[in-house]
Amino acid sequence: MTTVYAWVDSPLGELLLVGEAEQRSGSAAGGGAGATAGHGLGAAGDGLGADGGAEVRLCSLSVPGQKGGAVVRDGWRHSPEAFTEIAGQLEAYFAGRSTRFDVPIAPGIGTEFQRRVWEVLESIPYGRTVSYGEVAARVGASGAGVRAVGTAIGRNPLLVVRPCHRVIGADGTLRGYAGGLERKKLLLGLEGVVG
């Protein structure tokens, strides 16, 4: 497995995308028979992406200065080609032409509780918001569990794609966002939620 990364320009600043590339068995790049087109993030050309023989799954999408955001590490491969598909989806989202993302996500990231919370985030429709308490109720947490839900939301490694910006305070105020409240306001404004 190879860790790949790229930077993508956006209204939030330069986004850092990190993924895991794994060679598909029987792929054209591997010389196997019966190769099929995959669902990787990128394009052909460097052995990564949809037709390059490797499937790339998104691990992280961070904004500049993000609390707990990914940082490029030694041994990671800079591979913008691996992220062609997600870059296009992000561009369409920021241009108002798309309301959802369809990208493969790396499995096994986060605790079981965090993954349950993140699944709720993925179910929040574009242009809608829910409270931290509503998320807690959906995962079966109550009372003090709201704090744990807030912590899990704050550790979401896939900003924008997994829309934690759609979670607000019970009183309608914007609270906590690893990328900063100004970016949360920008995203909700883009979706027509705040002016």
Identify the function of each model-found stretch.
Residues 145-149:
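Helix-turn-helix DNA-binding helix
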Residues 161:
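Major-groove DNA-recognition helix of helix-turn-helix-type DNA-binding domains
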Residues 1-143, 194-195:
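Basic nucleic-acid-binding alpha-helical/helix-turn surface characteristic of O6-alkylguanine DNA
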Residues 164:
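Short cysteine clusters
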Residues 156-157:
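Terminal helix-turn-helix DNA-binding modules in bacterial transcription factors
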Residues 170-195:
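…primarily DNA-binding HTH/wHTH and HhH modules…
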